[in-house]
């Protein structure tokens, strides 16, 4: 007996798992371990950038304009400083840019309107190290002109808040000086892709993906805005500590031509763990990122199949969280 077996329109049986645009990189996407959370969360955003570039879609650019953080547009090739589609382009992960894949909305904004949705962003100490290096690379010898360094800086005990808090006017002056140089020095620094869900549900919104790029100077301004550099403070929070880290790194670059980031971060801990520099909730980030494309991301969920290719989704290993399983198992309560 003969049977008619319809031919499948698409098959990835003979196609290796891969991500759009990442044909040459230091990651092998045919291996399951390459699809683990830590690597996928940086690989996918870069692939998304390549996909958007192939469609002629500009990324959102958070940069300094008239002393304020503004959201404009930037070509992906200007972010990477190379043509993403070029067959000779090689993507070396863990090098040039910080990448922070963020969910939209977070728990502080999920009950608000879409226009007020925001993403929590968690910044690790390494990102502040990269920020200091980026500023030093761009400014070179002129970095010293931006620095407000007191004469007694070499004699300070940086681990002691009572000695560091009087430095706040100098830190404030330095960060403001850097922001005032935005027209000549700012460059793309941090990639913040957003993925949007329907409120706090696990379902993707129809328009669910977009890319926001922070310039290095805009990120300095962001740190400045969320820090409390008032000399009357009684303690140093994470945001303010981050401003201190950045200032100390830049001071050491000017004075010694280098800095020891491990020593600075350990010395300036102020009784707070160093696992992260700081975290800012969606209520805070929305103020700086608010835009039409934050409210309605430009890439549709139906396009994800054009980015994750060759059955790569089957190699993903999402975290198993008990609260998420309970939340998605409504039948348990019937």
Curated annotation (Swiss-Prot):
What are the protein's UniProt keywords?
Endonuclease, Hydrolase, Nuclease, Restriction system
Question: Would the keyword Hydrolase be found if you checked this record's keyword annotation?
Answer: yes
Keyword check for Mitochondrion, yes or no.
no
Query: Entry's InterPro entries?
Result: Restrct_endonuc_II_HindVP
User: What highest taxon heads this organism's lineage?
Assistant: Bacteria
The UniProt entry's GO biological process terms, in alphabetical order, are: DNA restriction-modification system
Its Enzyme Commission number(s) read 3.1.21.4
So what does this thing catalyse? Endonucleolytic cleavage of DNA to give specific double-stranded fragments with terminal 5'-phosphates
**TM annotation in the entry:** none
Which GO molecular-function terms appear in the entry?
DNA binding; type II site-specific deoxyribonuclease activity
What is this enzyme's class at the first EC digit? Answer: hydrolase
Free-text function comment from the UniProt entry: A P subtype restriction enzyme that recognizes the double-stranded sequence 5'-GRCGYC-3'; the cleavage site is unknown.
**What is the protein's name according to its record?**
Probable type II restriction enzyme HindVP
Organism annotation? Haemophilus influenzae (strain ATCC 51907 / DSM 11121 / KW20 / Rd)
